[in-house]
Amino acid sequence: MARIFVVSEYVGANQNSTGYYWEKIIGKMQREFGGLTVIFPLTAGETPPVVSPSVDQECFKFPRSNKNRLLSRGLAQIFQAFLFSVKLTSRARRGDVVLSGTNPALLLMTFPLLRYALGFKWVLLVHDVFPENLVPAGVLKKDSIAYRLLRRLFSFIYSSADRLVVIGRDMEALMKEKVNDPRSLVFISNWACEKEVFPVPREDAPFINIPEWKGKRVFQFFGNVGRLQGIENILSAIQLVKNEKAAFAFIGDGALVDSVKKHALEDQCARLRYFGRLPLAEKNFGLAACDVALVTLEEGMFGLGVPSKAYFSMAADKPILAVMEKGAEISRIIDETGIGWNCPPNDPVALARLIDEICELDLSSLGGVPRSVLQQNYSEYISLEKFAACVRPLLSESKI
């Protein structure tokens, strides 16, 4: 009988947003099909992810590396990819179905060979598109030899999967140009669980009950404060905002946190605050701590990623100010549903002007709309049913 394997660096909601989604997928696969095995690493000193006891777990110990040192990180990924491969080789057989993601990238590179050697069916969940995403990150130049070589390599890797699950329609269009058979592509959007993420009054978020912010319109960035999120563009725009009602809250962690902290310290008007990283248990209070959610991507990220924070903000019933290229998945949702506003990336003047305008708007007409859009189109139930529908025919083929 064919079995299902999930192979992922993160498998628990207590780890990060990637772990959140994999935990939900794991639960659905186990309930729908049974016979599920999850292969994942456990870094020294890390809190173990919460995995259902009904799921067969193949966990391997993994030494902690310094993510800020390229050599240390590279060696760690090589070792991790090797351990993943050993575990999968010892368990998976012809006809089994293996689900994996695009990280770590070195593990992704081993899958075409493993699939050929072991004969399993491969479902790849695409959160990141390599090597295109290395260009806006400043790691590679598009006209470099390394980029062209990696593009050919990853086109081969993506084409080796039986099913490619993409999380945005812009990503789907990009991937059609990369793979040999576009019929392998399946669009399944990100989601948020409406039972776990729900609206909370802003005044109930204790950490933003700042006397100076009474009557302010709070714009919030919540999540990964990373290099691909267009952070510098937001910070530049904040300096240009003229409306005195505007206030800005940053919650999260990432490579550009120090830059956010620096701007907060230099902000003489005290309208920019950094609140650190929130525990998962407090996510609803964090999402409540604003009037408008800022969802941003760096210029050049079209088709390369979809911020999951947008779906959580919808569940929390917050309108969205999307700063990204036109036609990107979140920008497209806003155009289709009217749950917010769009602004092009890398244009702080335009962003500041739009923030000034939003500060003068009556937002009461948007009450209930973002959450309703999520419930009707981007609920957990809808997306997980699509995952089951994606895997089911592969299992049926294995029985023949």
UniProtKB/Swiss-Prot annotation:
<keyword id="KW-0328">Glycosyltransferase</keyword>
<keyword id="KW-0448">Lipopolysaccharide biosynthesis</keyword>
<dbReference type="Pfam" id="PF13579">
    <property type="entry name" value="Glyco_trans_4_4"/>
</dbReference>
<dbReference type="GO" id="GO:0016757">
    <property type="term" value="F:glycosyltransferase activity"/>
</dbReference>
<dbReference type="InterPro" id="IPR028098">
    <property type="entry name" value="Glyco_trans_4-like_N"/>
</dbReference>
<dbReference type="Pfam" id="PF13692">
    <property type="entry name" value="Glyco_trans_1_4"/>
</dbReference>
<protein>
    <recommendedName>
        <fullName>Probable glycosyltransferase WbjE</fullName>
        <ecNumber>2.4.-.-</ecNumber>
    </recommendedName>
</protein>
<comment type="similarity">
    <text>Belongs to the glycosyltransferase group 1 family. Glycosyltransferase 4 subfamily.</text>
</comment>
<comment type="pathway">
    <text>Bacterial outer membrane biogenesis; LPS O-antigen biosynthesis.</text>
</comment>
<keyword id="KW-0808">Transferase</keyword>
<dbReference type="GO" id="GO:0009243">
    <property type="term" value="P:O antigen biosynthetic process"/>
</dbReference>
